[in-house]
Amino acid sequence: MTYDTKDKVLFSADGFGKFGALDAEEDWACEARRYYIGIVGKYGAQVQQVLKKAAALDIQIICPLHGPVLKENLSYYLGLYQTWSSYAVESDGILICYTSVYGNTKKAVMQLAEQLKNYGCPKVVVNDLARSDMAECVEDAFRYGRIVLATTTYNADIFPFMRTFIHGLVERNFQNRTVGMIENGSWAPQAVKVMKAMLEKCKNLTYCENEVKIRSALDDTSKEQLDALAKE
C-alpha cells in the first residue's frame, strides 16, 4: 500500500477492492466482503496492523486495484474492514449450511429454520452447499455469529461439498463463532465427529450442547433434538 501525502490518497492494492461493473447499482459490502474473505481472509492479523497505521493518516480517498474509488463515508469502509479482519460478528442471525443426499437432511434443516424463526431469531439464512456459490457460503460463515452444519455420513467421512466448505473456513482462520451440528447416517452416523476434527485448528469456537442425530429420516427422538437445538 502507498499513501500520497499531497492529495491524501491511500492506494490500497487488494484492500477495499471488489469485482463488478462500476456502473451497476449494487451494495458495496456484499461483493467486497466475498472478495475480502476469499483473498485476504486468512491474513486478519496483518490487516489489523495495516489498519492501525492507517488510523494515523488523514485519508480522503481510497483507491483499490479493483472496484470503485472511495471518496465518501470512509469510516464505513474502514469499520467493515476492522470487523472482518478481527473475525468479529458483522450481522445478527443464524446461518445453516447443509448437504442432503435424498432430501431428509434438507427436511430437518427446513424444520429447524422454521423453529428458529418461531423462537424469535431475527434472521435465518439457509445454504445448500451442493447448489449454492461456495464462495458466498464461506462469506456468510464469516458474517454471522452462529452457524449450523448439517450433513450426511458418506464413506465413513462427510459429504464432499461439506468437506470443501469446512476446508474453506479452516484455511481462512475461521474463529469466534458458535457452531451447532446435525448428522445423518443409516447405521453409523459419524459426521459430527468428522466435522469437529476438521475444525480443531479454528480458535474460539463454541459448540452447542444439543446435537441432532438422524437415522436416515427424522423420527420423534431426532425431532426433539432438533427442537432443543433451536431453543439453544
Regions found by a protein language model. Give the residues of each.
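Short amphipathic alpha-helices and their capping/turn segments at secondary-structure boundaries
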Residues: 1-10, 51-54, 134-137
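Conserved beta-strand elements of the Class I
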Residues: 3, 10, 93-97, 180
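Cofactor-binding loop segments of dinucleotide-utilizing enzymes, especially the Rossmann-like FAD-
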Residues: 14, 98-101, 129, 183-184
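FMN-binding flavodoxin-like domain, especially the glycine-rich phosphate-binding loop
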Residues: 19-62, 66-69, 111-127, 137-232
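Short gly/ser/thr-rich secondary-structure transition/capping motifs
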Residues: 79, 126-132
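Short, charged N-terminal beta->alpha structural module
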Residues: 97-118
